[in-house]
């Protein structure tokens, strides 16, 4: 039940993606990206709504063609979450989606074109009050930087980013955030650390092309965890070769683990052993599925025996400590007279958790310090 994070966040400027504040101490925004064909409007809208349901603050949509831009117009009309248009190669697509109400433009300086094309995009963004994300990726650096450095390095990624930052500065445009993603954890982490020392703009974090659901989640947790623990990062995306909904869940789990931002239940559960008095794994899995709709930040400990059960329960909003036939139940750290039948734990716990959630402030947010 700890509500204060020891992390002091890097001070950054404030921009808005739609109505979502980014930077300057705002809650770290969690976003994902659709993996449907953008021209399949029905499927894309359905996926965006699924992402919004699990807490996505922002959703990015790839817009590779003018046909996709026309589809984007229809998609935007049917969803409420802010949308970022992912633009590569053809700057005219950025101009088109700007007409259709896009909330943010993501462009890659390695392939968007010459300075005049960038100027056209920036002028349009300024006129329509649309922020830009400069998205540098280790796999698509400019050719001259590939020649200069021989391979992606932190210096190469940051030089690419700073070229575009300087260009936007010359155009008197400051409504932007920056990312320097790489698939290698150390390359990404060192790139973000270097960039954080050079600019005050918000930083969008990500380990790009991280891998499948399990390996990608681990890689992202390691890389982003290092950066977030140092106070670096204002938005994030977990890149998984999996259902995008899982990206949002993992993103919130990372923030929750660092006590930066909580959404939903933080289950504290033992891996179980021969001392367990009930099926811990089955109980936790069932509750996670049943209670996905709960957004209230809450710690729930489910421990199968009395070795660690009481101790964990005493620092949780709700807790269960396994005992023979009936297990001990705790609320706000205090043991209750009521005991739970080990053969019906899921139903009993679900009822208690839902009742507790209805009593708590669902808008509660963990306090985070920001550097002066």
Curated annotation (Swiss-Prot):
Cofactor needs: [4Fe-4S] cluster
Molecular function terms, GO-annotated: 4 iron, 4 sulfur cluster binding; 4-hydroxy-3-methylbut-2-en-1-yl diphosphate synthase activity (ferredoxin); 4-hydroxy-3-methylbut-2-enyl-diphosphate synthase activity (flavodoxin); iron ion binding
Cofactor binding note: Binds 1 [4Fe-4S] cluster.
Pathway in which this enzyme or protein is active: Isoprenoid biosynthesis; isopentenyl diphosphate biosynthesis via DXP pathway; isopentenyl diphosphate from 1-deoxy-D-xylulose 5-phosphate: step 5/6
Top-level taxon of origin: Bacteria
Alphabetical keyword list: 4Fe-4S, Iron, Iron-sulfur, Isoprene biosynthesis, Metal-binding, Oxidoreductase
Pfam families xref list: GcpE
Protein name from the UniProt record: 4-hydroxy-3-methylbut-2-en-1-yl diphosphate synthase (flavodoxin)
Native species: Vibrio parahaemolyticus serotype O3:K6 (strain RIMD 2210633)
Highest classification ranks of the organism: Bacteria, Pseudomonadati, Pseudomonadota, Gammaproteobacteria, Vibrionales
